[in-house]
């Protein structure tokens, strides 16, 4: 019999994230997780390791909106427009969360935060730019492991609201 711990050990995924995948019936996603000893802490590192476009990496950023944590899923090639996040949430103030708040909220360290399977239930926003690809890669709970997933499935399993919060260029 396999357990989240043995699955996590085989895949390189964090045990909490492996358990979340099993609870969602996503064992096949766990089987596709890939561990890279050189690390996938940043979107650029993950894209280089996987061999995909930077925009195919789903990065997760944690913000504090009027003191309440909110998670934003963004494609790896884009930047979050904090003013758009503020407007989307109707918040007076939105700031980047520090490492302590990230770990307290999600249960994971910066550079390995997955899109779901967090310690606490938190509001999640997903930028529409993620839908431009058939598959995106996201962290599997460690700064060395990523997994592929269809963007709409990622948004659904994260319980995210689909929004437009990326910075506009030019």
Regions found by a protein language model. Name each.
Residues 1-170:
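Extended, low-hydrophobicity, polar/charged segments
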């Amino acid at each position: 019999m396999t357990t989240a711990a043995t699955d996590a050990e085989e895949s390189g995924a964090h045990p909490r994230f492996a358990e979340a995948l099993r609870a969602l019936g996503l064992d096949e996603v766990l089987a596709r997780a890939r561990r890279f000893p050189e690390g996938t802490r940043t979107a650029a590192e993950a894209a280089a390791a996987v061999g995909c476009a930077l925009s195919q990496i789903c990065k997760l950023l944690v913000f504090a909106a009027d003191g309440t944590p909110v998670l934003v899923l963004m494609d790896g090639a884009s930047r979050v427009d904090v003013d758009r996040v503020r407007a989307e949430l109707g918040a007076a103030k939105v700031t980047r969360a520090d490492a302590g708040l990230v770990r307290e909220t999600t249960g994971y360290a910066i550079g390995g935060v997955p899109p779901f399977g967090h310690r606490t239930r938190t509001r999640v926003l997903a930028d529409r730019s993620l839908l431009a690809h058939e598959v995106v890669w996201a962290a599997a709970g460690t700064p060395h492991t990523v997994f592929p997933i269809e963007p709409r499935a990622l948004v659904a399993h994260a319980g995210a609201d689909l929004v437009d919060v990326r910075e506009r260029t030019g």
